[in-house]
Design a protein with these regions (language model features):
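C-terminal extensions
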Residues: 1-158
Length: 158
């Protein structure tokens, strides 16, 4: 007799998905579609030849900082944008704000996401969501549930 594996009480439950959702971002998308990039920043990036998400991912962060020459756009900020864009391009269905939250919690790619504990990561993202940066990114959207985070993790594994 095969006994069904019991999940611990209250364990995070990822959505059972036969078909994964589409990626929310692709390399050929305009750079303004990338997480954290608004119209003003997109213009600054376009001025140094970064027109698409693919261009952003290829950009040398230190060179970008020098070329853009805006106090608030450091090499680290560029690396964060790149990590957010990479997550949105490689984890099916991941929204911009979710990618921003993950990078803020030092989850910078799908491989790192695939190894995370849903409960701990959910708590970290929720705490970031209370910060000024988190509130700007998250807006009025509800915080992700532990099941949402478990779903991101499962999608990252596929």
């Amino acid at each position: 007799i095969k006994v069904p594996r019991e999940l611990p009480e209250g364990a995070p439950l990822a959505k059972k998905e036969k078909i994964l959702p589409k990626f929310t971002l692709s390399g050929d998308a305009p750079v303004v579609n990338a997480p954290s990039i608004g119209p003003k920043t997109a213009k600054r990036l376009e001025a140094v030849g970064v027109r698409t998400v693919g261009d952003l991912l290829q950009l040398d962060a230190e060179q970008g900082e020098e070329q853009i020459d805006a106090r608030h756009i450091s090499a680290q900020v560029i690396r964060d944008w790149q990590a957010q864009a990479l997550l949105a391009c490689t984890v099916p269905g991941l929204k911009s704000r979710e990618a921003q939250g993950l990078v803020a919690c030092d989850v910078r790619d799908a491989a790192a996401l695939a190894t995370k504990n849903a409960t701990e990561l959910c708590e970290a993202v929720a705490n970031w969501g209370l910060s000024e940066e988190g509130q700007r990114a998250w807006g009025s959207a509800p915080a992700p549930s532990v099941d949402d985070v478990a779903t991101w993790i499962e999608r990252a594994k596929r």
